[in-house]
Amino acid sequence: MGCWLKQPQGITTMMGCWLTKSRENILDNVIVTDAKLKISMNFEDCAKKIRKVACQFEVKSCITDIDDQKVLVSGDFNLHKLVKTLKKKTGKKIEIVTKNEKSSEDKVDDTVQNEDSKDEIVPQNADKPETSIMEVEFDIPFLCEKYEKDFGKVISKCTGVETYVVDLENKKVVVIGNFDKDELSRKLNKKMHQKIKKAEKERQEWESEMMLREAEEEKRLADIYEEIDKDRNVSLNPITDYEKEMAKHYYMFSDENPNACSIS
């Protein structure tokens, strides 16, 4: 008893270490189905390194979003060990935004005895709807920087969407979350047809404007040629005294021989 009283600080330290190890042991046994992490990523090399580390664990997919600094991991894996390894390999601070732990009830089934004295297995989660994160890729032929925000609004309003990545170069969008992909596909197709109609209308308006400009230019040139012909006719066939006087000042040269004598 005297020893316990003389060294309370050492005992406290030992107790704290024991609690820390116990907590880590508990976390090591926790399996999650999906998690969203916040990690600072400046370049694609950082994202590749994170995906490479995640592949060492039992993960189904690892999606990195450099713009939002988010990493979405799905599968049956140990989140505590994954985060610990990522911190060690990257040296970056990692924040767990969301996580879904795998319930132990999903593996335990109840045994019920029926009227024939036979055992029947009844799953615990038979009435529970399955909620899983999925990754769906949508091809959008008319996707460009001009329409990126419009399609982004459609995706963001869809229920169950966690995040999405726009690939302008390959004309596609990768959407991640627990959502109705058929409904989202219909909405994206509707928005795409709207953009096609708008682009067609803009093209027709542009063609009409160009035709109008060409007509105006042709009319302007016709007026110029008409004025030139009128002046030439006056110089060749003067009628009034004024035209006869003005005709004296005109000099006409032959186009065939510019060095020929002039007619005045």
Curated annotation (Swiss-Prot):
Q: Which residues form a coiled coil?
A: 185-218
Domain named HMA is located at: 32-95, 133-204
Lipid anchor positions (S-farnesyl cysteine): C261
The protein's matches in PROSITE patterns, at most eight in alphabetical order, are given as:
HMA_2
Recorded GO MF terms: metal ion binding
Report which superkingdom the organism of origin falls in.
Eukaryota
Q: Which InterPro entries match?
A: HIPP4/7/8/17/18/19, HMA_dom
**Pfam families, per the entry:** HMA
Propeptide residues, per UniProt? Answer: 262-264
Keyword Metal-binding found: yes
Q: Keywords in UniProt for this one?
A: Coiled coil, Lipoprotein, Metal-binding, Methylation, Prenylation, Repeat
Q: Does the keyword NADP apply?
A: no
Q: Which residues carry this modification: Cysteine methyl ester?
A: C261
Family statement: Belongs to the HIPP family.
Its biological purpose: Probable heavy-metal-binding protein.
What protein am I looking at? Heavy metal-associated isoprenylated plant protein 17
